Each structure stands twice: as C-alpha cells, then as structure tokens.
C-alpha cells in the first residue's frame, strides 16, 4: 500500500534566517518522517507514505520538465492565479519559477508562459533579493533553495550573453561566485522504496 507524494528535497530549506521556520513543513522530510511514525503507530504499519521526488532538487525537476514542451501551455504553480488557471506574474512564486526555467529556456518562450519578462521588471528587486541573497528572508511561498536560484541565474546569464534583462544585469554586477552544479545531486535522506530508486537515477 503506497501513498505517493511529489515533494522534492528543496522543500526542506527554512525561511527565516537563524530559525527553523518552514511554512512548507507538510512538504518536508521532517513531516514525512513524523507522519510515517504516526501511521505505523496508530493506523496501519503496512502503508508506505513517501515522496517519490524527495531525492531530487527542484532544479533537477525543472531540467527534466523543460524536455516536455507540450506541457508549457498548461502547467501552473501560482497560488494567486490558481483560481483562473494562470500565472499572475506578480508574486514571488512566479518569479522563482521564471528564474528556475530561465536557466533552460529563452525569454521568448518564458514570455509565452508568463505573459511578460519578469526579469526585466525593476519593481521585483526586493522579491528577487529574498530569493537569492544570504541574510534576506525568503518569501513565504513554496519556492526552492537559494543555491538553486543562484545556479539558475548563473546559467540564465550565460544563455543570454550581453543581452541581459534588468534583474539579471543587476545581479551580474555583484560578480557572484560560480555556483556548484546540481546535475548529480541526490538527497539520501528519503523514504523511497529501494525498488523505485532506479527511476530517479
């Protein structure tokens, strides 16, 4: 008996500097471990509750996702736009997903998805800084790690050469260090059954 979720490793990063505060607790490995114990103790120890994507980062999921362009017009992950099945293109979640995908896609494709180039909007400076800079609290949205954002920005800048939209140009001027690749990332703190691990490698 399996209850399978799709929460990734990135959901474990806390949101408030210096404190273990995570509004995504229900998506974290900590919750997964706690709930598995509860199920075993009080419900049915034959039930396996786990997140299949837990070993992967959200960056790796995005890298895989962009190989399926047929889903670009229909996928959606914006809380504000959920009722209308659109991207509001004005919140931290939209900006985060835009940055993540900008590592792999050109701006023309991204504008078709989001309706505008979010990296060319000066008004998103504060949201941008919260997603990428140490010492800045992350937005209370379901967004990935700052390491993923930095890697995505590094790749996005390389893809675009000298033609950088405002927020990329602003970030490039800080001369950020070259981030570590996540191609081979694998979080071993997971509950994926051994016979399914091969699906993720």
Question: Residue locations for each model-derived region?
Answer:
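Nucleotide-activated chemistry modules centered on ATP-dependent adenylation/adenylyltransferase
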Residues: 1-201
């Amino acid at each position: 008996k399996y209850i399978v979720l799709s929460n990734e490793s990135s959901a474990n990063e806390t949101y408030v500097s210096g404190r273990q505060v995570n509004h995504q607790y229900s998506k974290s490995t900590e919750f997964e471990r706690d709930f598995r114990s509860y199920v075993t103790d009080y419900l049915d120890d034959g039930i396996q509750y786990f997140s299949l994507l837990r070993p992967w980062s959200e960056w790796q999921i995005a890298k895989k996702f962009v190989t399926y362009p047929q889903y670009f017009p229909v996928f959606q992950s914006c809380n504000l736009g959920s009722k209308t099945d659109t991207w509001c293109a004005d919140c931290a979640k939209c900006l985060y997903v835009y940055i993540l995908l900008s590592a792999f896609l050109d701006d023309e494709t991204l504008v078709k998805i989001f309706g505008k180039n979010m990296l060319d909007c000066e008004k998103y400076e504060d949201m941008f800084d919260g997603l990428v800079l140490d010492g800045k609290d992350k937005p209370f949205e379901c967004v990935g790690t700052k390491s993923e954002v930095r890697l995505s920005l590094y790749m996005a800048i390389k893809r675009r050469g000298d033609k950088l939209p405002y927020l990329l140009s602003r970030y490039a001027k800080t001369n950020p260090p070259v981030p570590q690749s996540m191609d081979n990332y694998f979080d071993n703190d997971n509950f994926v059954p051994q016979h399914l691990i091969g699906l993720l490698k």
